[in-house]
Amino acid sequence: MESSSTIDPAEVAKFEAMAAEWWNPHGKFKPLHQMNPCRLDYITQQIAAEFDRDLSAPLPFEGLRLLDIGCGGGLLSEPMARLGAEVIGADAAPRNIPVAKLHAEQSGLTIDYRNTTAEALAAAGERFDVVLNMEVVEHVADPLTYLTACRELLKPGGLMICSTLNRNPKSFAMAIVGAEWVMRWLPKGTHDWSKFITPDELYDLIRKAGLDPVDRKGMVFNPVSWSWSLSARDLSVNYVTASVRRS
């Protein structure tokens, strides 16, 4: 794997230690398993709208080349492959790749998993119709450099979906105190609140990287139904954005 100025070794080490847990819905990645239907709803709707695809078709994303950055064990890569996309899953943590490969093989899916970075792929001339950049930007050392690499990875007209965590007292209370300290959904230290990014800050970074933001939604957890939903108004903790490379 090529070195990169945006890779934070301490952040990579956190997820290396949890690699075997990726496909355990009751394990350390339980929050991502719970959030995944909400994330997939947003991703599929945005891709369908941008590329004029019919989600009721058998393989609606056939012909689209998609990169899942920070793919982990493949929680998003696999659904995208099932929808017909040609999927490349990239992760900076080496131990995640064999976990993802094995699960894809067991599921009868063809996914190209690589231990690499966004910068290395961009330097190699790789280009994609869609880049998924989900819960990654808050873990990198230099968000602008990282997002600029994401822009380079997109073909003109390509779509980037980027999700992260807002930075405010509520997100500290829920994502750090609640999720890590009280509920213990995640190991302590998984997130660094100082690296969280407000929606306006992210939009500014996306524009500076050369992309055009076109949509953003909150992802809101309901403790009564124990489920996640999209919200046009509540971006106070988790949120997701869509951006397009115009040229």
From Swiss-Prot:
GO terms for biological process: methylation. Pathway: Cofactor biosynthesis; ubiquinone biosynthesis. Gene3D superfamilies: Vaccinia Virus protein VP39 (3.40.50.150). It catalyses: a 3-demethylubiquinol + S-adenosyl-L-methionine = a ubiquinol + S-adenosyl-L-homocysteine + H(+); a 3-(all-trans-polyprenyl)benzene-1,2-diol + S-adenosyl-L-methionine = a 2-methoxy-6-(all-trans-polyprenyl)phenol + S-adenosyl-L-homocysteine + H(+). GO terms for molecular function: 2-polyprenyl-6-hydroxyphenol methylase activity; 3-demethylubiquinol 3-O-methyltransferase activity; polyprenyldihydroxybenzoate methyltransferase activity. S-adenosyl-L-methionine binds at R39, G70, D91, M134. Coiled coil: none annotated. It comes from the Bacteria. Keywords: Methyltransferase, S-adenosyl-L-methionine, Transferase, Ubiquinone biosynthesis. CDD domains: AdoMet_MTases. Its EC number is 2.1.1.222, 2.1.1.64. PANTHER family: METHYLTRANSFERASE, UBIQUINONE BIOSYNTHESIS O-METHYLTRANSFERASE, MITOCHONDRIAL. O-methyltransferase that catalyzes the 2 O-methylation steps in the ubiquinone biosynthetic pathway. Belongs to the methyltransferase superfamily. UbiG/COQ3 family. This is Ubiquinone biosynthesis O-methyltransferase.
